[in-house]
UniProtKB/Swiss-Prot annotation:
PROSITE patterns per record: COA_CT_CTER
Single GO MF annotation: ATP binding
Catalytic activity from the UniProt record: N(6)-carboxybiotinyl-L-lysyl-[protein] + acetyl-CoA = N(6)-biotinyl-L-lysyl-[protein] + malonyl-CoA
EC assignment: 2.1.3.15
Domain CoA carboxyltransferase C-terminal: 40-294
The protein's assembly and partners: Acetyl-CoA carboxylase is a heterohexamer composed of biotin carboxyl carrier protein (AccB), biotin carboxylase (AccC) and two subunits each of ACCase subunit alpha (AccA) and ACCase subunit beta (AccD).
Name of the protein in its database record: Acetyl-coenzyme A carboxylase carboxyl transferase subunit alpha
GO biological process, alphabetically ordered: fatty acid biosynthetic process; malonyl-CoA biosynthetic process
Enzyme's top EC category: transferase
Record-stated family: Belongs to the AccA family.
C-alpha cells in the first residue's frame, strides 16, 4: 500500500501513523502477536481523524479536495464497471488527456462516463495537464455526449479540475467558445445527465461538463466560480488572503446545497475519500443509480424543461433607480 500523504492539519496523526507502521513491520518480521496494540492505535487514530474532519474550514476542505491520493475519474470508472471502453479524439486533430470519456455499463445499464483526470505524480500530471482541459478536451466531451444522445445513453460526468487551461494557445484555439458551446448543447440533450464534483470544481472548466439534471458533490469537494487564491489576488491583491476568500465564496457542499446550486451532498469516509476509496465508490454508485432511476421515468420534454429551469433560477440581482436604493436592500452589518 502506498504511503499515506497527510495534510498539514492532520499533523496530530503523524506520530500515531508512525507507531501503527512500526507495529505492522514488527508483525511482519516476527511471530509476536501485536493485534491488540494495533487495534487500540488504529481505533485511537480513527477517532482523532473523525474529530479533525468534523470541523474543517473551507480552506482545509480545499486541501482535501486537492489531495493527491483522492479517487479520480478513472478510479471510479474502474470501480463501477468491468467493460469500460475509452473513446478518443475531438475529430479535429486533438485528444486532450485532461478530459477523458468512454462507454461502460453499471448494473447492465449502458452509460457514457466522462470527466477530468489528474495525475498521481509530476510525470502523470504533465501528461494530464493537472486536470486542466484545453479546447480539444471540451470538444471531445461534446462529441461523446452527442454520441450518447444519439444512442439514448445516460451521461455521467465527474468534475475535478482547478479550471480550464488558460494558456495563450488555448485562448487562440477558442477555449471560451468551446465551453460556451458545451453549455448550450447540454441544455438540449434528451438523455439524463448526472454530474458529480469528486474533487475540485473550478470555474468554467467545471461548467463545461456540469450542465446536468442532478449535480452531486462529495462533502469535502469544492465548487467555485474562481479559486480562492485567484479571488484573493483580485480583491485584496494578496494570495495569502485565500482562506478568507474561501469562506466568502461559499464553496462547500453544505453552503451550495442551501443556495440550491447542488442537489445532494454525499458523505465521505472518516479522513476523506482517499482513506477508503471503495467506500466512496459505493456511496457514489448508489447515489447515481437513485437519481438515474428517477430521471429515466421522465419524458424527454420534461427532462429538458426542468434542466433549463434548474439553471435559470440560479442567482439574483437587485434593480433600482439609484445607488441609495440598492444599498437600502442590502442587510447592514451590526456592530
Amino acid at each position: 500500500m502506498a504511503k499515506r500523504y497527510l495534510l498539514d492539519f492532520e499533523k496530530p496523526l503523524v506520530e500515531l501513523e508512525k507507531q501503527i507502521e512500526q507495529i505492522k513491520e514488527l508483525a511482519r518480521d516476527s511471530e509476536v502477536d501485536v493485534s491488540q496494540q494495533l487495534l487500540q492505535l488504529e481505533t485511537l487514530a480513527a477517532r482523532r481523524r473523525e474529530e479533525i474532519f468534523k470541523s474543517l474550514t473551507p480552506a482545509q476542505k480545499i486541501q482535501v479536495a486537492r489531495h493527491p491520493q483522492r479517487p479520480s475519474t478513472l478510479d471510479f470508472v474502474q470501480m463501477f464497471c468491468d467493460d469500460w471502453i475509452e473513446l478518443h479524439g475531438d475529430r479535429n486533430g486533438g485528444d486532450d488527456m485532461a478530459l477523458i470519456g468512454g462507454i461502460g455499463s453499471i448494473n447492465n445499464r449502458p452509460v457514457l462516463m466522462l470527466g477530468h483526470q489528474k495525475g498521481r505524480d509530476t510525470k502523470e500530471n504533465v501528461v494530464r495537464n493537472f486536470g486542466m482541459a484545453k479546447p480539444g478536451g471540451y470538444r471531445k466531451a461534446l462529441r461523446l455526449m452527442q454520441h450518447a444522445n444519439r444512442f439514448a445513453l445516460p451521461i455521467l460526468t465527474f468534475i475535478d479540475t482547478p479550471g480550464a487551461y488558460a494558456g495563450l494557445k488555448a485562448e487562440e484555439q477558442g477555449q471560451g467558445e468551446a465551453i460556451a458551446r458545451n453549455l448550450r448543447e447540454m441544455f438540449g440533450l434528451k438523455v439524463p445527465i448526472v454530474a458529480t464534483v469528486i474533487g475540485e470544481g473550478g470555474s468554467g472548466g467545471a461548467l463545461g461538463i456540469g450542465v446536468a439534471d442532478r449535480l452531486l458533490m462529495f462533502e469535502h469537494s469544492v465548487y467555485t466560480v474562481a479559486s480562492p487564491e485567484a479571488c484573493a489576488s483580485i480583491l485584496w491583491r494578496d494570495a495569502a488572503k485565500a482562506p478568507e476568500a474561501a469562506s466568502a465564496l461559499k464553496i462547500t457542499g453544505n453552503d451550495l446545497l442551501k443556495l440550491g446550486i447542488i442537489d445532494e451532498v454525499l458523505p465521505e469516509p472518516s479522513g476523506g475519500n482517499n482513506w477508503a476509496p471503495l467506500d466512496a465508490g459505493n456511496t457514489l454508485k448508489e447515489a447515481i443509480e437513485k437519481h438515474l432511476n428517477a430521471l429515466l421515468q421522465m419524458p424527454e420534454d420534461q427532462l429538458i424543461e426542468e434542466r433549463y429551469k434548474k439553471f435559470r433560477i440560479l442567482g439574483k440581482f437587485i434593480e433600482a433607480n439609484n445607488i441609495e436604493e440598492i444599498y437600502s436592500e442590502i442587510p447592514q452589518k451590526t456592530e
